[in-house]
Amino acid sequence: MDGEKVKLRLENISQSFITNNRVFDAAVDVSLDVKDNEFLVILGPGRCGKTVLLNMIAGIEKPVDGRILLDGEEINGSDERIGMVFQKRALMPWKTVMENVEFGLKLKGVPKDERRAVAQKYIDLVGLQGFEKSYPDALSGGMKQRVSIARAYTNNPEILLMDEPFGALDAQTRYAMEEEVQRIWQTEKRTVIFVTNNIEEAVYLADRIVLLTNCPAKVKAVYDVNLPRPRDTVDPEFLRLRKEISENTDLAL
């Protein structure tokens, strides 16, 4: 992906917290370029600081050192150009699928007919047509995550952050959602930064994989994934890359 536009740049960012009167380093001197329309996966062992990095990009937390640039301009705090999908599906249980998906546009004052048309487009895109009037309690885990993805896309983000969005799903549903998010990304072509601790998931989805060390998070290696889509998980090159990354991944202690 050399020569492609840099959409997001992390320059020497670090994060630390005070815990029990001691300084806890969560991320140290992380630098990273994310290309426009790239599907970038941040991979690392559990509790290594992946989510901390994502929270800094989202503006939920401010780095103690370094800076974050979006289209060459430093960002501080939340930015409407960045959307986020969490592992825990933050849906409003008292609102229908349509009301959840259109909620961000409603807050922006978008007229009802216009926001409903946009929301319907993404409800259809994630395969939930016919469930517009359903409430979250009536949906499966995978369907709830589809609602979260549709809601994020409805707000028209330039960058979509996904924090282990399929971690709580069973294996079969997780695989189906991996296929689905790849299809949606190929249709919409937004920049996606996807966090996971699952090596096979990373190789299946990514254009590039950024492997982090155990906590505090540092960039340990970067892998280009030059495999055709849709990917075959038993392809020899897929298996070779998965093995190489596995052997280079720190254990979570």
Residue ranges of predicted features:
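Conserved ABC ATPase "signature" region
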Residues: 106, 113-131
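Conserved ABC transporter NBD signature motif
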Residues: 66-78
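A short, proline-enriched helix->beta-strand linker immediately N-terminal to the Walker B motif
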Residues: 154-158
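Conserved ABC ATPase signature
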Residues: 135-139, 143
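Helix-to-loop junction immediately C-terminal to a conserved catalytic motif
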Residues: 58
